[in-house]
Amino acid sequence: AEMYMGLVELGVGLLPAARGSLEMLERFRAGCPDDPSFNPLPMIQGAFMNIGMAKVCVGAEEGRTFGMLRPHDQITLNPELLFHNAKEMVLGMARAGYRQPRPAKFRLPGENGATAIKWFLDGMTRGGQITEHEFKIASLLSRVLTGGDTSTRVKVGQQHILDLEREVFLKLCGEQKTQERIQHMLTKN
């Protein structure tokens, strides 16, 4: 199915908010053991790279590969059937007794994980691959995805991640370079 999907907010100096970062984190953390000794950093790095590189998938199957679509997300090729298929899916869920899942809890590496990602980013900055402002944005994204002030010994809830998302989003909205990027996008693109 033809589709273009991605979290491209970093291009204008922001990060995906309103659950965008949280959703990507949840999708890459799916299936991870609930074990304080488990290192979640490789999964977090997958989410980080998708968001940080503003990857855009072309097509539904690539969307699954990138974690933009979940394995159980349905695809409707015919736009005329979209409403019908959605209605049938919802009715089927209701008949099956669907209940909203409990909010996820995460064991995240906190500042230790963010430091590892920042080390990688520092190399990209020194190599001229990203600007200082992009380093700042990506560093703040790493703080969100690694859980801020926490460690794998502690479980944090979705609201904790959402609070970090909001805090970082608002901080970036106040950055002059972000405002310039947004203005450029609105006037030139």
Language model features with spans:
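Intrinsically disordered, low-complexity segments enriched in small/flexible residues
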Residues: 26, 30-55, 59, 71-73, ...
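CoA-thioester-processing core
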Residues: 1-39, 45
